[in-house]
Amino acid sequence: MKKFLIAAMLGGLLGVVVAPQLARPLLAKETNQAETYKQLELFGDIFDRIRAQYVEEVDDKKLIEAAINGMLTSLDPHSSYLSPDDASDMRIQTRGAFGGLGIEVTQEDGFVKVITPIDDTPAAEAGVEPGDFITHVDGEGLLGLTLDEAVQLMRGPVGSEIVITVVRESEPEPFDIKIIRDTIKLTAVRDKTIGETIVMRVSTFNDQTYPNLEDGITKQIEAAGGIENINGFVVDLRNNPGGLLSQAIKVSDAFLEKGEIVSTRGRAPEDGDRWNARTGDLAQGKPIVVLINGGSASASEIVAGALQDHRRAIVVGTKSFGKGSVQTIMPVAGDGAMRLTTARYYTPSGRSIQALGVSPDIIVEQPRKDPNSTKEDTVEVEGATRTEADLRGSLDNDSLSDADREQIEQERARAEEAAKLRDEDFQLSYAIDLLKGLSAIQPAQ
């Protein structure tokens, strides 16, 4: 009987304790909802006052779209509202052709910052560089505008001229750049062979990226007479602003036999996802160097991070941009769309790239060309590479055959080409030299 009474008392006490604990979340939820409705009433009140009392008549649709966009852009630099026209433009861009200047931009502290100019576009040809801040478009200031509003100012008819004012860290004063708008046709991948190295220049991640990559590698291997005549691959991701996650996964998978490529984690555990490599390596086990710089962002960082973590590639260059978030495009009423950050992505080792970027295994800066350098400077450098054979009256090597002399001439031509490449693109030259070195110490097949 005593045991029963004790049990009953405990049950009663637990009931007293548990009931408030169950009630608290419900009360908190009701309080939060009440506060939300209160804030929505405030929004409605302000909206009505603007319509009634603003100095000029306002467009209700534009006002609401601006409010929606303000709500989204307050979250992070990559979330935004896309009007029906903007949503249509974005779908065109992922297919590989659109009109404009050819730059990828973001917003930093209220200013428009260039992530990178896209290869062979008006912006790239006009001299726009990664890290440039655009302060004015045709004399109109951009400070205070949303990113979409600033981008809208830069749009215009193909063939029309635009003047952007740029602030660059290496320049003491802002300066203007004139650009002629054009149709931007993105070539996702360019392929070539330099010496015994296949160079794959990946400039964006759109629907054409992986098919172009696969076709280019196959073509270059066949042209070389087989993979045995190739010492390695350079995957050039410099100034690549990113693009489709699905294409970044396919490009990474192209060089990995197994293991995780990338994972994403959202707010809730069930929002996460993971992608793994499948058997097959387009490079057939040959060494790979990945080139990155501050203009390499998003999908580029997924590829660089995956190949680096699996020790499948040596990453060379400078630290990447550091965009480690995933945006989901969600259709909304009225044919518009919402670009919302829904997850962060992580490399196979669990690294988050967000705001940190991918650090290269070997840091190699791209030297800035000195505009004040003269032809005499170049001649002096070339003179430093002279050999005994270049001296007047030097003795001939009497043991050389015609084949030896032909080989010497070929080596001289290759050396001249290498010197030219070092002057034009030091980072790429370094990557190719690195693969030559790796090839030299590998055991004979």
Question: Where do the model's predicted regions map?
Answer:
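Cleft-lining beta-strand/loop regions that shape enzyme active-site pockets
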Residues: L26-Q39, D48-D60, K113-T116, T121-P130, ...
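Extended, small/polar residue-biased N-terminal targeting/export presequences
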Residues: Y54-I115, G159-V163, V167-K178, I184-A188, ...
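Short acidic, Pro/Gly- and aromatic-enriched capping/linker segments at domain boundaries
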Residues: G334-A343
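Conserved functional hotspot residues or short segments at active or partner-binding sites
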Residues: S349-Q445
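Terminal targeting/pro-maturation regions of precursor/exported proteins
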Residues: K2-S79, V112, I227, L400-Q445
